[in-house]
Amino acid sequence: MSDSDITFYCLSSILSVLLIFIFILIKRKQAKPKLNLPPGKMGWPFLGETIGYLKPYSATTLGEFMDQHIARYGKIYKSKLFGEPAIVSADAGLNRFILQNEGKLFECSYPRSIGGILGKWSMLVLVGDMHRDMRLISLNFLSHARLRTHLLKEVEKHTRLVISSWKENSTFAAQDEAKKFTFNLMAEHIMSLQPGKIETEKLKKEYVTFMKGVVSAPLNFPGTAYWKALKSRGTILKFIEGKMEERIKRMKEGNENLEEDDLLNWVLKHSNLSTEQILDLILSLLFAGHETSSVSIALAIYFLPGCPQAILQLREEHKEIARAKKQAGETELTWEDYKKMEFTHCVVNETLRLGNVVRFLHRKALKDVRYKGYDIPCGWKVLPVIAAVHLDPLLFDQPQHFNPWRWQNNGNCPNFSGASSNSNNIFLPFGGGPRLCAGSELAKLEMAVFIHHLILNYHWELTDNNDQAFAYPFVDFPKGLQIRVQSHSLI
């Protein structure tokens, strides 16, 4: 057989195998049922509809993009966001289904830039067993017992430090004061840093730069907010590592400071985490522990002047607590006092519902999922929009109206059209499922104690009615929420 014959037979064999392979692929594609994707559009190449989705809007609304898409496509629609095909959910049932099936059908999937700045060991971006282990560390240190015996005192101490510094008839940015309160609390709680000290103030300054980068476009070149934040990240980690080395040295020498009953000490003693893991854990807890709580407190300060009846009822509730403490010769709040703040808890819930500090979550489908006749393909991004449920007029009467009384009678929502009328099914300000925020109870405690001392000691008014809360999508006050305060005493 000649060389040309051999070449001919080889090429024929290869071509035959290739044709058979193509035939099998075509048959498989034909056999596979067509996906029934939710309605929607994918927008521009690569960008999709991301620019419209992230366009700033009033925080007490869903914004033009969501309103238009829900009106056109319904509460579940497809889009292309953050460079990926996505399913967006404004549906209470689907949102709950997504969160309850974390690790089974869905998993956390934040943009890569978030992991780049918070760190690969940050609880926000971790999944699976490592996230569970990191979360358990946080839960152990934020336990119910610790809230009662230790953290309540610390929360009240830092509240008083901030509020007592306000001058009569002065005007200032309330959001900055709320951030000062929550940062000082977390800095002491995590690393025993004292407010007002040079090292604490330096760390706070770096954290301001860091935070601007977390919420900015991930453009990593000199001068951008993201680039500056990465620089600040390095400075913050160097500071934390220095504190770690000091603690480890003292532990080895047996010279521990018993007053340093903080997270850093706990992690060094009770975990097997690497240095890198501890650094990312502390960095992310400082971020999570002070940023969202401070915005929630600022929102309460913003909403309450528009509801004078709520302020009157709060004053009556807190006057009663203060009078009882005075008669008993006590000065510090107790856990029993906190539990008596029933209407305050309603105000906290309503602030979280209407303000929606965390507006949506990032998830991706681990498998092909079918829900209400729609297919969610494996690998697609899934965005449960928490704010859309909290502002749904079918679930909450007059949802854009600040109404704390809706949370009375055990928080039942009379307009919830489901099998259960309990608001726990639809009210998810801290997420849900296995990734429920570990600091949710601390955040509510901070808000209640801050409101307690604010109501007892000050009248306040907003000095700029145009300084509204905006969603970028992170919630912020463009001018810092300027208020004027006048002192008074209710006891």
Curated annotation (Swiss-Prot):
Catalytic reaction(s) noted: cholesterol + reduced [NADPH--hemoprotein reductase] + O2 = (22S)-22-hydroxycholesterol + oxidized [NADPH--hemoprotein reductase] + H2O + H(+)
Residues the entry annotates as binding heme: C437
Keyword Membrane applies: yes
Impact noted for substituting F65Y: Mimicking CYP90B50, increased cholesterol 16S,22S-dihydroxylase activity and production of furostanol-type steroid
Coiled coil stretches, renumbered: none
Residues spanning the membrane: 6-26
PROSITE patterns: CYTOCHROME_P450
InterPro entries: Cyt_P450, Cyt_P450_CS, Cyt_P450_E_grp-I, Cyt_P450_sf
SUPFAM superfamilies: Cytochrome P450 (SSF48264)
EC number of this enzyme: 1.14.14.-
Top-level lineage group: Eukaryota
Membrane topology type: Single-pass membrane protein
Entries under Gene3D superfamilies matching the protein: Cytochrome P450 (1.10.630.10)
GO CC term, one of those recorded: membrane
Pathway connected to this protein: Steroid metabolism; cholesterol metabolism
Effect annotated for changing V155S: Mimicking CYP90B50, increased cholesterol 16S,22S-dihydroxylase activity and production of furostanol-type steroid
Protein keywords: Brassinosteroid biosynthesis, Cholesterol metabolism, Heme, Iron, Lipid biosynthesis, Lipid metabolism, Membrane, Metal-binding, Monooxygenase, Oxidoreductase, Steroid biosynthesis, Steroid metabolism, Sterol metabolism, Transmembrane, Transmembrane helix
One Gene Ontology molecular-function label: iron ion binding
Function of the molecule: Canonical brassinosteroid (BR)-biosynthetic enzyme capable of converting cholesterol to 22S-hydroxycholesterol via sterol-C22 hydroxylation.
Family: Belongs to the cytochrome P450 family.
Protein name: Cholesterol 22-monohydroxylase CYP90B51
Species of origin: Trigonella foenum-graecum
